[in-house]
């Protein structure tokens, strides 16, 4: 990682602080106000510089579309696959505070290779064998096709569903008739694909 300038470090520290305190990243206007910039455009230029240095990711079309990347790198420093529990709003899915532990399982046993495990909550995908408490092996990618089971972030909620794109609308289908599809209007809602499901580990097999 390239070193940050003092001003960039101030912006980065403010983003981290806002996420820790409020659960959400700041808007450009909030950054400008708190750090004394003349306009939100000045804040945007600093954010672009941080993105070029790969410490944050800017999510297009969202006023609070800022994601910190450094924690994701730190989560991958330990051997094994990181197990992700609950995910806080506005934070990277691989942020250190989300990692419950690392499982000593070979990522290459999955195709494509798994990058992390996600603890499944609920029974919305039980009809295809994804049960409450299972560990879902996930390959981190945003390159997905219709019909794939994905880990998606809708606004601030993370969910596991089957993807269907219809123009500017995305339907996230459950595999349980008791659950209605989640409909996402991409013109007004933020959708981030965190990865695709590549396998299941029954939690009881590893505890």
UniProtKB/Swiss-Prot annotation:
Top-level EC class as recorded in UniProt: hydrolase
GO MF annotation list: DNA binding; serine-type endopeptidase activity
Site positions (Cleavage): 89-90
Catalytic reactions of this protein: Hydrolysis of Ala-|-Gly bond in repressor LexA
Active site: 124, 161
Keyword vocabulary terms for this entry: Autocatalytic cleavage, DNA damage, DNA repair, DNA replication, DNA-binding, Hydrolase, Repressor, SOS response, Transcription, Transcription regulation
Membrane-crossing residue ranges in chain numbering: none
Pfam families: LexA_DNA_bind (PF01726), Peptidase_S24 (PF00717)
GO biological process entries: DNA repair; DNA replication; negative regulation of DNA-templated transcription; proteolysis; SOS response
Its biological purpose: Represses a number of genes involved in the response to DNA damage (SOS response), including recA and lexA. In the presence of single-stranded DNA, RecA interacts with LexA causing an autocatalytic cleavage which disrupts the DNA-binding part of LexA, leading to derepression of the SOS regulon and eventually DNA repair.
Similarity section: Belongs to the peptidase S24 family.
PANTHER family: LEXA REPRESSOR, LEXA REPRESSOR-RELATED
Record note on quaternary structure: Homodimer.
Protein name in UniProt: LexA repressor
Originating species: Vibrio vulnificus (strain YJ016)
Lineage, highest ranks first: Bacteria, Pseudomonadati, Pseudomonadota, Gammaproteobacteria, Vibrionales
């Amino acid at each position: 990682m390239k070193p940050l300038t003092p001003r960039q470090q101030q912006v980065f520290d403010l983003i981290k602080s806002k996420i820790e305190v409020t659960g959400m990243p700041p808007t450009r206007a909030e950054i400008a106000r708190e750090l004394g910039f003349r306009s939100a455009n000045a804040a945007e230029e600093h954010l672009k510089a941080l993105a070029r240095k790969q410490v944050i990711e800017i999510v297009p079309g969202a006023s609070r579309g800022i994601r910190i990347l450094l924690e994701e790198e730190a989560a991958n420093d330990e051997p094994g696959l990181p197990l992700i529990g609950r995910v806080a709003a506005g934070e990277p899915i691989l942020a250190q505070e989300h990692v419950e532990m690392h499982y000593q399982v070979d990522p290459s046993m999955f195709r494509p290779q798994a990058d992390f495990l996600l603890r499944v909550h609920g029974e919305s995908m039980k009809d295809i064998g994804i049960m409450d408490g299972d560990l879902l092996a996930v390959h981190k990618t945003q390159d997905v096709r219709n019909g794939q089971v994905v880990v998606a972030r809708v606004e601030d909620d993370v969910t596991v569903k089957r993807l269907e794109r219809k123009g500017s609308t995305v339907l996230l289908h459950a595999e349980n008739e008791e659950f209605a599809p989640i409909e996402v209007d991409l013109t007004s809602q933020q959708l981030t694909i965190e990865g695709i499901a590549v396998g299941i580990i029954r939690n009881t097999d590893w505890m």
